[in-house]
Curated annotation (Swiss-Prot):
Entry-linked NCBIfam families: L29
Keywords assigned: Ribonucleoprotein, Ribosomal protein
Keyword Ribosomal protein among UniProt keywords: yes
One Gene Ontology term from the biological process aspect of the record: translation
Classification via SUPFAM superfamilies: Ribosomal protein L29 (L29p) (SSF46561)
HAMAP family: Ribosomal_uL29 (MF_00374)
Species, as recorded: Lactococcus lactis subsp. cremoris (strain MG1363)
Transmembrane region(s): none
PROSITE patterns xrefs: RIBOSOMAL_L29
Name listed for the protein in its UniProt record: Large ribosomal subunit protein uL29
Pfam family, any one: Ribosomal_L29
CC annotations in GO: cytosolic large ribosomal subunit
Gene: rpmC
Family affiliation: Belongs to the universal ribosomal protein uL29 family.
Amino acid sequence: MKLSETKSLLKDLRALSVEELTTREAELKKELFDLRFQAAAGRLENTAKLDEVKKTIARVKTVQAELNK
């Protein structure tokens, strides 16, 4: 993910409410589960997607922590 894409994603995440962030995190965790299952089955072609989803989950959690301060 390019820096400009990351900044855009963070801007979008900061515009969301706490409930929307929680929903987004749950969606990402389900996507990560599905990707891990595909990787274990040998059907995942783009393995970089795993790292991207993990980092996005971390970004969502960071924004949630910022809102809880």
